[in-house]
Regions:
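Cysteine-centered metal-binding/redox modules
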Residues: 2-156
């Protein structure tokens, strides 16, 4: 595949993982919703990210403006190289893989696209996301309580 020879082998291997692929495709779908809502006046076209070159999107390749394409390319790489396994929600992760500006953009995009995704055919994915979110929130809270208890014990 043209362009694939320049891709990092680790990226290609990680993108073979169905969880990584599913997350990247979901990000692509969400960024399309954001781009449609915020950049409707911009020229958009088929994107050429490494994920597209690998064929992870199938026939549903994202059509985005240049700015959103750059965000998608960055997000694909961050997801592929996530050091956590299983990957927690980024909001509850101790390791921040995203640059601060990119993290803020992703949060805003998710806040906008999440509720709208239900009307775009992602209702089941949304329900799974809510259930997983509750699980990771509880794990993060339990970890914080344990850390606080350890700190209290050490200070005595």
């Amino acid at each position: 595949m043209k362009g694939q020879e320049r891709m990092n082998e680790r990226f290609v291997e990680r993108m073979k993982d169905p969880r990584v692929t599913r997350d990247a495709v979901t990000l692509g779908d969400f960024i399309v919703i954001w781009c449609d809502g915020h950049h409707g006046d911009r020229r958009r076209g088929r994107v050429l990210t490494d994920g597209v070159r690998l064929g992870i999107y199938g026939r549903r390749e994202p059509v985005l403006c240049e700015e959103c394409e750059a965000h998608l390319a960055y997000a694909e790489k961050r997801r592929a190289y996530c050091p956590q396994d299983p990957k927690p929600f980024c909001a509850y992760c101790e390791t921040h893989c995203y640059r601060a500006d990119e993290r803020e953009w992703q949060r805003a995009m998710m806040r906008y696209s999440g509720p709208r995704s239900w009307r775009k055919g992602h209702a089941i994915d949304g329900i799974k996301h809510l259930l997983n979110g509750r699980k990771y929130r509880k794990l993060a809270q339990a970890k914080a309580r344990a850390a606080a208890a350890t700190t209290r014990e050490e200070s005595r």
